[in-house]
Amino acid sequence: MPSSVIRKCAIVGAALLLTLAGLGSAANAQQPRYSHHYAEDRAEIEDLMARYLFAIDYNDWDAYVGVFAEDGTLEFASGSSTGRPAIREMVTKFAQGIGRFYHTEDGKPAKLRHVILQSVIRVEGKRAWARSLWLEMANHGPQDTMKMGTYGLYEDELKKVDGQWLFSKRRVLNEFIKSRSSGPGNPVVDMDAAAEAFLKGGPAAK
């Protein structure tokens, strides 16, 4: 093989290795660092998420508003409310009207059950961000069998208040509602961007 060809192959190989190394570094740079408290924080946040679902499915409004900070915000298809009293008012009105959409064959309100699938949680000190896929099901299928109603994405901001994680903002996106869908991009990228902006003192820090 001519030496010129060997040199060209060597140059191409070296360029490929540098490219792969750069891609690897970029991928590593996108991964957040986890503190030694992360497992404990994540467990507490996952527990909070579960308590939210049990509260809404069993109409326990004291428990429901209790997962939000005093100045917390809830945003979903019915609108946006800030503060526990306003959140309670909005969500109870929503629950009272849900029978129009979910009901058994004899016309009674169906039993709704929410499920969280996977969650990505970013913790930075006493602030956290999360993205979770959720789905909703109810016994409003034929002969009152279970039927999946809708699904979507939770966009969460959390803060630690007196040693307890609480929602400072929960945004509920619904893939069945065009104006409330999550969009084509990876939601985790936006979550990490919000966390990085907070760390740098940008708009997300407010």
Question: Where do the model's predicted regions map?
Answer:
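Bacterial N-terminal signal peptides that target proteins for export
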Residues: 1-13
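Bacterial N-terminal signal peptides
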Residues: 11-22
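Short, low-complexity N-terminal intrinsically disordered segments enriched in polar/charged residues
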Residues: 27-67
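Short beta-strand edge/turn micro-motifs at domain boundaries
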Residues: 30, 127-131, 151-187
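Flexible low-complexity loop/turn motifs enriched in small/helix-breaking residues
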Residues: 39-40, 118, 123-127, 184-206
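A solvent-exposed, acidic/Ser-Thr-rich amphipathic alpha-helical stretch
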Residues: 61-134
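Short, surface-exposed coil-to-beta transition loops
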Residues: 114-116, 148-154
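Beta-strand elements of well-folded, non-transmembrane domains
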Residues: 136-138
